[in-house]
Amino acid sequence: MNSILREASPKSPHVHFNAIEGILELKGRSIPENALDFYKPLIEWMGEWVKSSPAKTEFHVHLEYFNTSSSKCLLDLFRKLEPLGDNATVLWHYEADDEDMLEAGEDYEAILSVPFRMMKV
C-alpha cells in the first residue's frame, strides 16, 4: 500500500499518511474550494488501509481551522477507523488557547467509537 504525501496550501492541510509506520497526519488549515474533491482520495485510502488490518494506527490531527464541509469529510475519515477498535487512536492536537478546536475534537470523540486523545500544544 502506498503512502500519501501532500504539501499544505493556503486552503488545504499538509497530509502525510505513512503506510509503513501507521502514522497519519493532517496539519494546517482546511478550507478547500471543494472539500469532497480534496478528501475523497483520503477517505478511499483510509478504507483500503483498514482492510489491510494494521496492527496500530495513529492519526494526528492538528488543524488551525476547518470549515463546515471539511468537518463532514473529517467525520467520514474518522468513521473509517472504527473497525480497528483500540488499534487506532486519533490524537487531536489543539493550541492551549483554542477552546473551539478542543470542543470540536470532543464533539467528534462523543459521536465516534474511535479512541481520541486531546493533545494540548
Where are the regions that the model predicts?
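A short, well-ordered alpha-helical element
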Residues: 10-16, 31-55
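Amphipathic alpha-helical interaction surfaces in cytosolic regulatory modules
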Residues: 42, 58-109
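Structural motif
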Residues: 18-20
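A generic structural motif
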Residues: 116-121
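Short, aliphatic-rich beta-strand segments
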Residues: 22-28
